[in-house]
Amino acid sequence: MKISVPISLNTLEHCHRDSLLKRLSQLGAEEVLLCYAALGFDAFVEEERAASIIKEYDAFLKGHGFQTAVWASTLGAFAHSGYTPLTTINGKPLTLWACPMDAGFGKAFCRVIEKIAALGIGKIVLEDDFRMQCCEGDISCFCEQHMKFYSEYLGRAVTREEMKEGLFDSAPNQYREAWMAGCRKGLEDLARQIRASADEVNKNLSFVLCCGPALFGGDGTDPEALRNFLSGDNAPAQLRLIGAPYWSVFNNPLNAVIDFPRRQAFECSKAGIECYGEGDPYPRPRYTCSATEVEFYHTVLLADGHCDRLFKYGCDYTSSFDYEKGYAERAEENRELYAQIKEMFHGKKCVGFHPLEPFDKVKRAHRLAMAPEHAVMDTALRRYTSSLSLPTAFEKGGVNLIFGENARCVECEDLKYGAVLDMAAAMILQERGIDVGIEKTVKHTPGETGHGLPVYDETYFEEKEVVGLYGKPVSCLDLVLKAGAKEESKLHIIDRDYTGSYTYENADGRRFLIYNFDMDEMVKTSGWVRSYCRQAQLARLYPWLNGSPVDAICLGNPDLYLLAKKDDNSLAIGLWNYSKDKISNPVVQLGRRYATIKIVGGEGRLEGDKIVLTTQIKAYEFCFIEVTK
């Protein structure tokens, strides 16, 4: 995985070049990105001086063997400039953002592209403000130009109020189609203009589009389509993924975040698109986001193997290159580890549970959020897999994990691998004519529970344990199950018992484990998902659901992240301890027996179909294991 390091132009004004070269060497950089805010309100240096710095350091860095590129802001760089701002559905102008349908904006931005290209730069990175959602408020854009487009699309004049009412109706409809078409047109037309402007100067100029979360459905287009518009005849565009170490600063655990860029990288690999990971600890320094989190991110993507490059933001955007040295020093310390991970995991395929979560679910969902980008950013499914330390693989074949609106997108044929459903997904599949073992339901909403006391609990029959359930009141269903369904756990809520979870095989041979609650509602609540019994139940039932055992699972360690990959002869396992607690003598249950074992970052042995580590995995440390037949 090649390393690219972003450097802000203003830090180059008075930099010590020896310090810069040292940090780049420590980070393992092959490419340096010169970050320029383009002409906008937050431009670090004025335009003429910026051009001078870019030329000077482009030559200097190339002279020291580095590749170079310029990074430019896009829709977020023209605040208070007189261009049409993005406008929310409530009519609020977002003055820090320009609307891509403004022809004047398009011309101005393309002029920036031409000027950068004229400096002899061969690659331009477009900031992840190339988007229309996830800006400052409610969904966009509802400026006059977009409203005119919606009216023409629908064949009659419409108001913002009518669009709002239609958009948040319970099902996809003409208003949602019009809104997504308007977003798509604005961004795709601008991408075409940018490519045409680049070709005027250099047909071999390439682009890297930094994805924002809204590009995955919320903006009506997708990264691959935009990438195609930005690609030249001899210059295929690349993508920088979204989902970074700094998301953990905003209450998104990194062990839950990491499967988002992993999934994007998998899709890029299938499509033959070169991609970069977003190894960003913004806002630096390590007081905010630790080097450990950056290394967690780096090593997971390296082991996964689908990400070609990594943006490693190891230098501060304001201070000197000697102010924050920790990110670079930690990367230098781990250089040998990177080589060991690559050797151990390279050439193998990820195995485990299959999270079924299509990127275009905003288009199909019956519940559109006011911030639709959240439908892909922080999902119940990723919180679930990280809470239970489940190995995940994005290629079909493992037990499917299907929650909520995702059930509208599942192909019936894929259910042959088995599926875990929440009740929302089960109801959707039943509406689609798929038998999930429910004869009849009566919705029941218990009253208030008091002051967070565990007056809910769940009894697991096979695990022989009762688990307290905390949190808000929950709506559940009083289920009458069909013959053949087996109750696996029982919910006791205030004064009544309900089915907690059950297994069922229908006449088509499709096997299910179904929870009697909505995962979106309860995934962050103690006991409902973050539970040793929930984890043990899954491990026990995987062979029944899928027809083959899970290749590797490690029970009983909160916030352990596990990744598994195998080939015909061996299995590689990565264990990342994202918990504040150490893990003493962890045991990894394997799907079969192996003959030999190799461990990096610990010691241990094979015992039948288990790996028993005899050393600890301390908080925020990792261990890598390879077993062979």
Where are these predicted regions, by residue range?
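A conserved amphipathic helix/loop scaffold
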Residues: 373-377, 394, 401-625
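Aromatic-lined substrate-binding rim segments of carbohydrate-active enzymes
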Residues: 20-21, 37-88, 190-198
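Catalytic domains of carbohydrate-active enzymes, especially glycoside hydrolases
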Residues: 15-40, 115-123, 235-239, 297-309, ...
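The substrate-binding groove and active-site-proximal loops of carbohydrate-active enzymes
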Residues: 3-12, 38-51, 91-110, 171-188, ...
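Short, acidic/polar
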Residues: 10-26, 103-116, 221-229, 290-301
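Hydrophobic targeting/anchoring helices
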Residues: 35, 122, 127, 133-134, ...
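Active-site-adjacent "subsite" loops/lids of carbohydrate-active enzymes
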Residues: 67-121, 128, 132-136, 144-147, ...
